[in-house]
């Protein structure tokens, strides 16, 4: 007997449509103004660090696509109880990473690239486990691309170095606001 689900088909179409339109207009449906400002700063950091505009655009576009798809899955009630526990764990790890990044930015001589890299790697692994049966291998590779890019010790060291002080300040301001508002 053939299994058909209009809900599943609609969700699949929604994910496909959103993957084709990962621009600002769609992102604003799922990503607030403060998050958008943080993403813009992460783009600038990536562009300056890699000296490649296309590479920086690709990593932020991948990040937005993943965030939108996970939001669609969550809002559509696609996650079971064990997956909701993983989603909670992911959010806690992401929050811990944000608080650690803030602490490193506010307290001189405390930065350790390995600590942030490990937290981002843990976030990646939990997120991959969360979406394992919901997203395609292409989306899984996007997740790896984003987290591997931002957990690069060289990039993290540059971000906390003197040349990126202004970017780091804006990122920390955004993270602080997201934490204060309970959005992270």
UniProtKB/Swiss-Prot annotation:
Q: Which residues carry this modification: Phosphoserine?
A: 3
- Name the gene behind this protein: TNFAIP8L2
Family affiliation: Belongs to the TNFAIP8 family. TNFAIP8L2 subfamily.
Query: How is it modified post-translationally?
Result: Phosphorylated by TAK1/MAP3K7; this phosphorylation triggers association with BTRC and subsequent ubiquitination and degradation.
Give any Gene Ontology cellular component: lysosome
Q: Is the Nucleus keyword given for this protein?
A: yes
At the top level, the lineage of the source is Eukaryota
Q: What is known of its domains?
A: The central region was initially thought to constitute a DED (death effector) domain. However, 3D-structure data reveal a previously uncharacterized fold that is different from the predicted fold of a DED (death effector) domain. It consists of a large, hydrophobic central cavity that is poised for cofactor binding.
Alphabetized PANTHER family for the sequence: TUMOR NECROSIS FACTOR ALPHA-INDUCED PROTEIN 8-LIKE PROTEIN 2, TUMOR NECROSIS FACTOR INDUCED PROTEIN
User: What subcellular compartments does it reside in?
Assistant: Cytoplasm; Nucleus; Lysosome
Its assembly, as annotated, is: May interact with CASP8; however, such result is unclear since could not reproduce the interaction with CASP8. Interacts with RAC1.
Principal place of residence: cytoplasm
Q: What is this protein called?
A: Tumor necrosis factor alpha-induced protein 8-like protein 2
Q: Which UniProt keywords apply?
A: Cytoplasm, Immunity, Innate immunity, Lysosome, Nucleus, Phosphoprotein, Ubl conjugation
């Amino acid at each position: 007997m053939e299994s058909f689900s209009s809900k599943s088909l609609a969700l699949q179409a929604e994910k496909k449509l959103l993957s084709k339109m990962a621009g600002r207009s769609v992102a604003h449906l799922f990503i607030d103004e403060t998050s958008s400002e943080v993403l813009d700063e992460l783009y600038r950091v990536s562009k300056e660090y890699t000296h490649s505009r296309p590479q920086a655009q690709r990593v932020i576009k991948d990040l937005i696509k993943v965030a939108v798809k996970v939001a669609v899955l969550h809002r559509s009630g696609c996650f079971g109880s064990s997956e909701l526990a993983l989603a909670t764990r992911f959010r806690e790890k992401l929050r811990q990473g944000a608080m650690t990044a803030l602490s490193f930015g506010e307290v001189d001589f405390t930065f350790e690239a390995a600590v942030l890299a490990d937290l981002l790697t843990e976030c990646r692994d939990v997120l991959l486990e969360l979406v394992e049966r919901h997203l395609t291998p292409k989306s899984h590779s996007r997740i790896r691309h984003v987290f591997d890019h931002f957990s690069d010790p060289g990039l993290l060291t540059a971000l906390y170095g003197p040349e990126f002080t202004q970017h780091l300040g804006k990122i920390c301001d955004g993270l602080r606001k997201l934490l204060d508002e309970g959005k992270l």
